Amino acid sequence: SIYITLSLLVLELIRLSQRIKPWFPKWMKGHWQQTKVTLFFLIVFGVTGLMIHAYHTVMNPIVKNVYITLPKAAGDRDSLTIVMMSDLHIGEVIGKDLVQKYVALSNAQHPDMVVLAGDIMDYESRFAENAHIEDDLKQLKAPLGVYIIYGNHEYRANRNAKYRWLQKTGGTLLIDSVVQPDSTFYLIGRDDFIHKKRKSLHSLMEGVDTGKPIIVLDHQPWSFAEMNMNGVDLGLHGHTHNGQLWPYPLLMKLVYECPYGYYKKGPTQFYVSSGIGIAGPPYRVGTVSELVVLHIRFKAPKQTGERGKSTMPIQAS
């Protein structure tokens, strides 16, 4: 474990500091062997407890409520509730039982729409196929539908089999696609950044009425400036896992403009999820497995007064 290694490294630094400038109390120096044994067991029990908590964090995702106000009107719709799940990584670790838990958690939020923001599967599709997990995802309930985009893991291993399986889940697969779930706003699902031939956002937005709210799903959070330049109102991302295991969250801050959470660049707002699943071992330290519930408020439409005069727009709070 990285944490046992770090603990031993700290102990070695303490030992070296003692050699350079003695500072241990007399009772410790007089019982050094017993002290080393005690420290060893403290490390083992401490790391074991940490890993139990880290496993529990993965197995019990939290519900993260995010409140966002968009500056455009969406027809007669004043609000929209979206459940966002990214980075399920269905495979050897994330199996049928956990996916059923995710679905139940999503349905309990009573969302208008559900989005699965990439990396639905880990490497091989056979784990999802053999367990018929598509039947579980079909149980997701949302009146405006379920929408799915590719992540980088959808391009690993048997890509065509993954595509066929995703088509069976009951959701709408958006690969460089634009839809209007209920005609009041646009939802754009981008192909993953790893695919060098994916369409530009500018080309996807040809014919889009920028007077309506525009929400973009893009697995990897690299395109903040592009979204801002093209008039996108809200970008939803995953991919980073927020580092998953400490101290990697610290490194993520050096790599990404925003590796986790809410962010705003110009008029465009973003949310980067740490993901509901995991990649690799089933542990999280210093991060969370999350199901994101986006509570979106739209600008109120112009209303006509009794004598036909237009009233001032009202900003929804």
Write out the residue ranges for each language-model feature:
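Non-catalytic terminal accessory segments
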Residues: 1-59, 301-317
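Soluble catalytic domains of enzymes that build or remodel membrane lipids, polysaccharides, and related
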Residues: 64, 69-303
